């Protein structure tokens, strides 16, 4: 491959050169949403983070199988395997079938992801569609001696596993810390110790979502689904497993334990985790009740919002921070992102207005190299964006006559902006934003202004003024130049 990509491996706590197990093929699994409510800003971050990774790996020439699951069963209210299934609870409260809840919110999630220009994964498996695979996983762990049956449920024996392996190697915890911080909850008497986690839960009589198993009717534990589905679609060993850093413990720690217990080693080579979106320093999330949904951002309908923000503003806002850095929500930060995005899109539009010269005194090759170097450095999107802003200054200086650019360099500059703005960062011009409207109305405005040029040549000042005044009233700024005209749509 042309580029040497390094990524931060949470397991080893350092940046490592990315070397696929079976190049040019790459297997990537990312934990998707539990679909019992509308997607919020916290859901957007992992989706955008791993969308950029998917795009970049594809750009580097890899053939990526990207699996992003849908959790539609087994995610209980508490990590200690207690409480009601989140989807079943929503269904009970709204007097719906659980799969009605799943389908409704999954449709809305897909719509929000499409608005954010997040590419669909190669495969989007549902936990409820892979019960057989999860039962087989539980059987293997039982056969290996790292699980036990208790009153119709099956639990992973963390203490026994820890004697032979290292439970806590991903999160940096040791078993004593886990035991000391595990809450004693009702129903824990089924477990040998409070740190044990459910592989299969017995269904109470009132529990709607249930399947037959060798241990009686029940449902899979939350952690089992990703191990089972990752193995089914990516094999016993694959390259990347991603998700939010809030999943490191217990979810991903438990996945490693399940993998090692069932097949003897870890399935995953690189573990990647994005940091959190916060509001006033507190993690944004459904369980905390402090979230703002993506639809509320797009409409401006939440009380904390001073205005609506377009999907591309949200995407740009997230990409302005490195994926491993926290991002704190504020209207000021989003408004700054909105202005920055507008500057970048104006630069892209201005590329079409440049007339090439015979020679160049700008360094396009260096700009391209710097952008790739930033992406190769653990997907450093904020540095890529800063280089693109340098490119925007280059464009403005060329238009102002301070620099010149040859036809070949202009072609390369257009390619740099298209590759990084659109193909890799996944930005797009939006109909409804000023940039999107410029793209949509461009030919019509150009045609009208060409008529105005003809009117002026014929000294038809009334028609010339009428066209200018009408376009100005619609928000277009018209500038006469020696070559004809320039225009832009003001916000």
From Swiss-Prot:
Main location: cytoplasm
Record's GO cellular component terms: cytosol
Record: residues binding Zn(2+): 31, 226, 251, 255
SMART domains tied to this protein: DALR_2
EC number in record: 6.1.1.16
SUPFAM superfamilies named in the record: Anticodon-binding domain of a subclass of class I aminoacyl-tRNA synthetases, Nucleotidylyl transferase
TM region(s), chain numbering: none
Pfam families hit by this protein: CysS_C, DALR_2, tRNA-synt_1e
Cofactor annotation remark: Binds 1 zinc ion per subunit.
GO BP term, example: cysteinyl-tRNA aminoacylation
Signal peptide as annotated in the record: none
NCBIfam families found in the cross-reference section: cysS
HAMAP family: Cys_tRNA_synth
Oligomeric form and interacting partners: Monomer.
Protein name per its UniProtKB record: Cysteine--tRNA ligase
Origin species: Bacteroides fragilis (strain YCH46)
